[in-house]
Amino acid sequence: MKRRTDLDTKSSRKVYKKYEYTEIGSIEEENEASINFYAVVIDACFPYKVDEKKYMCYLKVIDTTHNVKEGDDNFAIVALQSRKFEDLPIIQRCGDIIRVHRAEYNYKDDQHYFKLNMSYSSSWALFSADEEVAPEVIKDEGDDFTYRSYAYSGKQYNFDTQDQKLLKNTRAWNKSYFAKNDVIIDEMYTPLSQARQEEGDFNVVGKVTQIVHRDYYTSDLRVKDTSKATWFLTVSRRKFPRLYEGVIIKIRSVNIDSETERERCLELAPHSNIMTFVPFSRLAKSLDSQISLSPDKVDKELIKKVILTEPVLATTTFGDYSELPLTELSEIFEDVTDKDAVFRARFSILKITPDRVEDYVEEYTPKGAPRSKPVYKVQFLIKDPSTALNDNLYKIYLYSHGDLGKEFFPGVDPSSAQTPSGHSKLRKYASTLMKFNVHIDAVLEKVGGAFFIRDTEMKF
């Protein structure tokens, strides 16, 4: 996908085919010919990998003849398929315009479907909803994006006087339509107060009331909607670079994070997307006035538990390996050999096993020893910014059978961990490790293909 073009379409010497464009509402159900059309995007998933040879992206689009009204969700579905991720559009603003060439058409169950196979002859181009440059593009001095695509498939795109007229008319209608209608109606998303009732993924429309950038790769969001419920979300800054406090967003396909002990946390799937709204959106303006940035009384206790402040390091390293440079998890776990090595990494803990702190310790009998001794045997599932774009969780161990790692929980060695006082301290430590903004700086030793924490201690 070409994200930024310097193509001067007026000076291009190539003679382009003149296309005939069709309005969605006027297409006959039995149509078998390929379709060209302009439409407004009201929903889009993030391009995602289906298998080794296929990437997909799904859009919901409308035009002057086929659009959403209150209680009547008329939209068309566009399915784009490609062998390469970069051939698919990344659309992160509800209300921007897409031009489609050579789409296959199908009408089923009162629904218009369009399919674009990017490996063959289909193509697309994205245009800003207004005459100003889209937020996706860094505009250089002198650039005029009135009639320029900010992203398109292939190496170049054609654009003639017919396209100028169609784009101008689509923009005019789009501005009026978004200003007079919510477009994203109630049936299209779930209030956050009802999120726990959802069994699968669902959509959310709300305001980002706080955002903390952990590092160059990851941000933590606090999201609130008109139901006055607040939920928390960790996102990739690479995938969603235009989020800020106060912005109204539409989250496509989110789930409740069931793998964390944190309360009210959402998680994204590879196809999940976060879209902002065009500036003339009636819905966005209405939500902005209704949703305050400050927390409501019912959420203050929650926010105390899930502290969304500047990221903090909960651990410190010591010993010979404490000065090692940081290595990303993607690099550490990429090595599938059994060669032993030592690394220093920084990451977040998403799950601790066993679930009960009373089970963190087990008896271990060293070879040749007359009796057993208590040791820590704890498993952590972790991620870091380098792994934010995949679904993988990485497994490491706190296993003190060789005396490495026994200092991890300060003031609680494996022997004292088996007392009521030790259990109480371990619960506090575990709660801290699972907090929203806590990072772990640890030395990891690879032994026989597994990774063990050593020379690392919590700073409490």
Curated annotation (Swiss-Prot):
The keyword Cytoplasm does not apply. One of its GO terms (cellular component) is nuclear telomere cap complex. Keywords: Chromosome, DNA-binding, Nucleus, Telomere. Its main location: nucleus. The keyword Disulfide bond does not apply. Pfam families: POT1, TEBP_OB2-like. This is Telomere-binding protein homolog. It comes from Euplotes crassus.
